[in-house]
From Swiss-Prot:
Signals that turn on the gene: Up-regulated in fallopian tubes upon infection. Increased expression in kidneys with pyelonephritis.
Consequence of changing E83R: Enhanced antibacterial activity against both E.coli and S.aureus. Disrupts homodimerization. Enhanced membrane binding and membrane disintegration abilities, as well further increased antibacterial activity
Highest taxon of the lineage: Eukaryota
Similarity comment: Belongs to the alpha-defensin family.
Described function: Host-defense peptide that maintains sterility in the urogenital system. Has antimicrobial activity against a wide range of bacteria, including Gram-negative E.coli, P.aeruginosa and S.typhimurium, and Gram-positive E.aerogenes, S.aureus, B.cereus, E.faecium and L.monocytogenes. Confers resistance to intestinal infection by S.typhimurium. Exhibits antimicrobial activity against enteric commensal bacteria such as B.adolescentis, L.acidophilus, B.breve, L.fermentum, B.longum and S.thermophilus. Binds to bacterial membranes and causes membrane disintegration. (Microbial infection) Acts as a target for S.flexneri infection by binding to the bacterium, possibly via bacterial surface proteins, and thereby augmenting infectivity via enhanced bacterial adhesion and invasion of epithelial cells and tissues.
Effect of R94K: Does not impair antimicrobial activity against E.coli, E.aerogenes, S.aureus and B.cereus. Reduced induction of IL-8 secretion
Alphabetical GO biological process terms: antibacterial humoral response; antimicrobial humoral immune response mediated by antimicrobial peptide; cellular response to lipopolysaccharide; defense response to fungus; defense response to Gram-negative bacterium; defense response to Gram-positive bacterium; disruption of plasma membrane integrity in another organism; innate immune response
Species whose genome carries this gene: Homo sapiens
Outcome of mutating G86R: Enhanced antibacterial activity against both E.coli and S.aureus
Protein name (database record): Defensin alpha 5
Post-translational modification: Glycosylated.
Alphabetically ordered keywords of this record: Antibiotic, Antimicrobial, Cytoplasmic vesicle, Defensin, Disulfide bond, Fungicide, Glycoprotein, Immunity, Innate immunity, Secreted, Signal
Effect of mutating C72S: Prohibits tetramer formation
Coiled coil: none
Amino acid sequence: MRTIAILAAILLVALQAQAESLQERADEATTQKQSGEDNQDLAISFAGNGLSALRTSGSQARATCYCRTGRCATRESLSGVCEISGRLYRLCCR
């Protein structure tokens, strides 16, 4: 009888751990979905050769930057941070 109670307790703990893992994944998926929406909130374009971070040899540089909550996209590089409504985001430029 004692063995059955111990096995039942172990089973309940395992099920609870699995449920927490599923909840974490669901929360993470929701966060990623929301950050995907946030990624397109602000686009900044720079043109000209006066910006030292965007200088090229003798030609006008052009960059498009996005304030992102997650990682920068494939062809973008991290160029700093930006602040919107008191929240900090990554400034990703290409």
